[in-house]
Amino acid sequence: MDNKALAKKQLEDTLSTLKQLDDNVWIMQYKSNYGLDKLLDKGCGNIMDAVKFLQKEVNFPALNINPDHSGFACSTFNAKTPEGGFILGRNFDYKAAPCLVLWTTPENGYRSLSVVDTTFFIHGTKYVPLKNAKRPLRVMGAPYMSMDGINEKGLAFGVLEIKSKATKQQTGKKPIITTVAIRAVLDKCATVDEAIDLLASYDMHDSIFINYHYQVVDANGTSAIIEYVDNKMHVIRQEKEDDCLALTNYFLTPGGDNHDGRGYDRYEKIMTTLKDKDGTVTEDEAMDLLSKVTLHYRHPALKHMVITLWSSVYNCTEKSMLMCAGMDYGKKYKFTLDKPCEYTVL
């Protein structure tokens, strides 16, 4: 089979797995080569670099990018489970839209389970169903649209916004944008230290004109916060083994610009709850905590609804994810890394 025929088959195989579970959740197993090594070697300094690469590598369609970044928020935390495992809890807050649960199996990297915000490239500014005849090729860029995920080594990773000046490092290293960095960590890193080292090896260029920070947890229970203040990378680590860390939408690094003040209340709620439970919660208790720090409001300038699109509890020991989407906490989905496109409704 020649390369063109192989690419066509991989495209068809991928799209054949695309399935809608309800109004808030789609699932898909990516069965094509998305060329991460080539992109990292080339460098990716802005969104259009990524789009042009995808157009060449995976038949991604031409489109104009006008990202609406206002209202992106989120919350994360790490904790232990009663069974001795480790979790990353995560709320993703943004413009109301469905999410896509994605399984990837790269040729030169770790398998992963991640969640894609379909607003960025797949739907654009006007919602169109994923299987609309004009849109299916957009899902071929999904590996570079994941906002959080977990890989086969039990490393979980998530991104959150800070309303501050975007990072644009210029130290002579190859550039990397936010969503490509997320994909690189999931595909290449087994531990927190490896994730930190990988991010430090690139010049970070925040994707859409605003600052981002990250929380990472691994199967050993190690967790860290990674932030960029004035174009310098900072790492906040646990003071003691198994300590709980949390992150919302302001800098934890001393000297960071926190004029906005978003997320203080959510951070305090998370940390107080975890302290009261000695840092140990079940997956259901973690989900209950996430349900108490959701967002739901109409954006004052852009007039769209900002909600918690999904709440996920990544189990770094089991390599699984418990998810509620669209703020429907009466329906829980359980996904596992080893069983692509299979799920249980709890």
Model segments located where?
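Short, structured patches in soluble enzyme cores that scaffold and shape functional sites
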Residues: 159-163, 181, 199, 216-220, ...
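Extended amphipathic alpha-helical segments with heptad-repeat/coiled-coil character used for oligomerization
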Residues: 209-251
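Secretory/export targeting leaders with adjacent low-complexity proregions
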Residues: 197-207, 214
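Mature, function-bearing regions of proteins
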Residues: 251-255, 262
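Long, charge-rich alpha-helical interaction segments
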Residues: 263-287
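N-terminal mature-domain region immediately after signal-peptide cleavage
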Residues: 1-189, 204, 281-346
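Alpha-helix N-cap recognition
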Residues: 191-194
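Non-transmembrane alpha-helical segments in soluble domains
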Residues: 183-186, 196-199, 271
